[in-house]
């Protein structure tokens, strides 16, 4: 079956035909930043028109929360201020094919889990450390989406009760300490301001302030991993995202994990899928979990 896969992020919308895990005819456009509701309707309509007649079903991975076909966000800033959007209904205006929706980090998790030996790893987590911090959870070989679509929003667990206010409105979330946005909130105030990419360049040159900032992020992720392992008996974790895959970051996380008792630790690896993880994961998940159900139920 041929899938039209869409990956809606805070800055871009990617689209492609996915067949047997292979990407074809990939394109990417900017996520609307002005008149975002109407802009999103128009963007989706154009993408559906571009691929008309070339797909058997639609799979969407999107930043934010997917619940009953509605897209919303814990942190609306991640979607250009878009607080709520009828995502499934918008797509359904342009196609009568089946539609399935899920969170982008959940989709990436499903893609990464396809690379695991499910008989050896039944409890798995993917963590993305990028502009924000997100993730997905597989328990007993099943991707957890939750009754409200919020399962896996691990970036909004507590890291520091006295920390900065997160974009979700809570104080001290992991995202408010470990993310690229959190790193930039500090580095932009330095005497010589810089973005997260330059922070890591300075970190690799042993700059004191940059090292402290990267270490703060890595410690928060190490503690998050320990919490996940001890609460859910996680066997393996993959870390991705622009921060998570930055040179020198994963070894720091592993270093801080070694300070904990061994029961809090598990195997950690770098995520294998790159920018197309959401597209591939969504295509696989919709086919495996929704289309292949005997009753054929499609939901999002």
Curated annotation (Swiss-Prot):
Phylogenetic placement of the source organism: Bacteria, Pseudomonadati, Pseudomonadota, Gammaproteobacteria, Pasteurellales
Name assigned to this protein: N-acetylmannosamine kinase
Residues binding Zn(2+), per UniProt: 156, 166, 168, 173
Family matches, as HAMAP family: ManNAc_kinase
Pathway note: Amino-sugar metabolism; N-acetylneuraminate degradation; D-fructose 6-phosphate from N-acetylneuraminate: step 2/5
Quaternary data: Homodimer.
Source superkingdom: Bacteria
Gene name per UniProt: nanK
Residues at which ATP binds: 5-12, 132-139
Gene3D superfamilies reported in the protein's UniProt record: 3.30.420.40
GO biological process: N-acetylneuraminate catabolic process
Function text: Catalyzes the phosphorylation of N-acetylmannosamine (ManNAc) to ManNAc-6-P.
One family name in Pfam for this protein: ROK
Substrates-to-products reaction catalysed: an N-acyl-D-mannosamine + ATP = an N-acyl-D-mannosamine 6-phosphate + ADP + H(+)
EC number: 2.7.1.60
Species this protein is from: Haemophilus influenzae (strain PittGG)
Alphabetized InterPro entries for the sequence: ATPase_NBD, ManNAc_kinase_bac, ROK, ROK_cs
Family the UniProt entry places it in: Belongs to the ROK (NagC/XylR) family. NanK subfamily.
Entry GO MF terms: ATP binding; N-acylmannosamine kinase activity; zinc ion binding
Keywords tagged on the record: ATP-binding, Carbohydrate metabolism, Kinase, Metal-binding, Nucleotide-binding, Transferase, Zinc
């Amino acid at each position: 079956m041929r899938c039209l896969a869409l990956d809606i992020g805070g800055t871009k919308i990617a689209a492609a035909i996915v067949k047997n895990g292979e990407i074809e005819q990939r394109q990417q456009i900017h996520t609307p930043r002005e008149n975002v509701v109407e802009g999103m309707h128009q963007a989706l309509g154009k993408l559906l028109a571009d691929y008309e007649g070339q797909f058997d079903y639609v799979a969407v991975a999107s930043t934010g929360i997917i619940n009953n076909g509605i897209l919303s966000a814990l942190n609306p800033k991640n979607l250009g201020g878009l607080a709520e959007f009828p995502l499934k209904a918008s797509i359904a205006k342009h196609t009568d094919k089946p539609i399935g929706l899920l969170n982008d980090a959940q989709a990436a998790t499903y893609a990464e889990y396809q690379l695991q030996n499910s008989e050896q790893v039944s409890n798995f987590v993917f963590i993305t450390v990028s502009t924000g911090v997100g993730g997905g959870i597989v328990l007993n070989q099943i991707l957890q989406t939750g009754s409200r679509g919020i399962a896996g929003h691990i970036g909004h667990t507590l890291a520091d009760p006295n920390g900065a206010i997160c974009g979700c409105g809570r104080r001290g979330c992991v995202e408010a300490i470990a993310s690229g946005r959190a790193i930039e909130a500090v580095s932009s105030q330095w005497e010589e301001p810089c973005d997260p990419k330059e922070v890591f360049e300075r970190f690799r040159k042993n700059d004191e302030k940059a090292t402290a900032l990267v270490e703060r992020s890595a410690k928060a992720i190490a503690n998050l991993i320990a919490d996940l392992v001890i609460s859910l008996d996680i066997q393996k974790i993959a870390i991705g995202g622009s921060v998570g895959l930055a040179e020198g970051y994963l070894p720091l996380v592993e270093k801080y994990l070694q300070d904990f008792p061994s029961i809090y630790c598990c195997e950690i690896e770098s995520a294998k899928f790159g920018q197309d993880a959401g597209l591939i994961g969504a295509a696989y998940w919709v086919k495996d979990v929704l289309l292949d159900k005997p009753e054929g139920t499609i939901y999002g």
